[in-house]
Amino acid sequence: MTALAWGQSPTIKVEGGMIQGVPSATSEVTVFRGIPYAAPPVGDLRWKRPQPVGKWKGIKVADTFSNICWQPGNAVGTFYGNEFYWKEQTVQSEDCLYLNVWAPADAIGNPAGKLPVAFWVHGGAYFNGYGHEITMDGDAWAKRGVILVTINYRLGIFGFLAHPELSAENPDGTSGNYGTYDQVAALKWVHDNIAQFGGDPDNITVLGQSAGAASIKNLVSSPLSKGLIRNAIIQSGGGIGSFGSSDSGQKQAEATGKSFMDKFGYNDLKAMRAVPAERLLEIFKAEGMNLFRPHIDGLLLTESFDDAARNQHLANANYMIGCTLDDIRPMGKQIDEFCFLRDSLDHRPAYQYLFARKLPGTHDGAFHSAELWYMFHTLDRSWRPMTEADYRLADEVMDCWTNFVKYGNPNKPGSESWKPFTLGNPYIKTFNVRYGE
């Protein structure tokens, strides 16, 4: 493949048409921002499963991140608003089913490249977040020979409302879980199209943090993602336990959705789909924040993650799992239990980590989500007074994460310094700066 001048990127064909990426801020990396992976879920497609993306004419230059899905957001003045969302506000829309790809520039248009692929699912309690948050960037991943994909998926009432009338219009008699269906659709899009970016469709690692990690647990449990996942990283999403998921069934989810919509006078599908998105978000923020999340519908999710793990129904993948130091009280035991199951039942032990760095600048410690600055190597975007030791730690974290994506093992080839967590040796890799740094 002939090298192209800086500022140029080859056009490639993906589902829907021709696209062209743009140079990233890092040399020798190309980024594709805002690629549609499904039709906009608007109008009659509100509360329907993702539909195939429409075709476009000409070349779509993927130079702009998309709108984000409707969400309450994290206001400046709150902890997470101050930490991650202080810089800019992003336009919200129901037309939000887009993904972003970072790849080495010389890999674009080379299906024989077979580079490993990381598929990132953001967190946010299933009602916040998007794929181009300030922490999230794929430059450092691509420089290490890994293609990074980040996605948006429907959230809150838009993504997880179940309702008897929605189920009645669906041939299989189920509703809800639209946000998880979006994730599966995006994963299938990546499998079908990533070779055009130089990626290996048979070497995809799914990873996520918090509700994104709970989403990864759903993806590795779902029969609909069978054969699409080689490796999985579960960050601060618990292990064996109910963190971030619901064991409720279809009928219970429908009853919750109907009761909520009836309360506000929306009693039929026509009325429900006519409600302005702003109004739906308003009532969701007022009384629905903890009501809508994935549930067991018998099709996408046929059993809980816990049962899938115990029944050996999880994706046949390598697993890395962990949390931050401040997460460890609620999550540590759950994570240990998952690792023990992997060793005792599957004889394929997982790799466990603990992120213990207490971030500089405040006394907030190693809080939930603290590792994001490090795993994307975006410390220079943070307002915190990051030190040289923090940058070295970010290098270490990134090396381990990208090694796992490449090899299913966080160690460099020939090294076993990070040992798997087994019954006989329950090893946990700790990430921190050295004492005194």
PLM-predicted stretches and their roles:
Residues 231, 239-246, 267-391, 395, ...:
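Substrate-gating cap/lid region and adjacent catalytic-acid/histidine neighborhood
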Residues 141, 221-225, 363-367, 420-421:
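Short glycine-biased active-site loop of nucleotidyltransferases that positions the nucleotide triphosphate
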Residues 6-177, 201, 386-397, 405-417, ...:
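Non-catalytic accessory segments of hydrolases
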Residues 419-437:
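C-terminal domain-tail junction helix/linker
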Residues 79-266, 309-332, 342, 347-348:
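Serine-hydrolase-like catalytic core of hydrolytic proteins
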Residues 16, 182, 200, 296-297:
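Acidic/polar residues in short coil/turn loops that connect beta-strands
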Residues 154-157, 207-211, 353-362, 416-423:
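Short, solvent-exposed turn/loop segments enriched in Gly/Ser/Thr/Pro and often Arg
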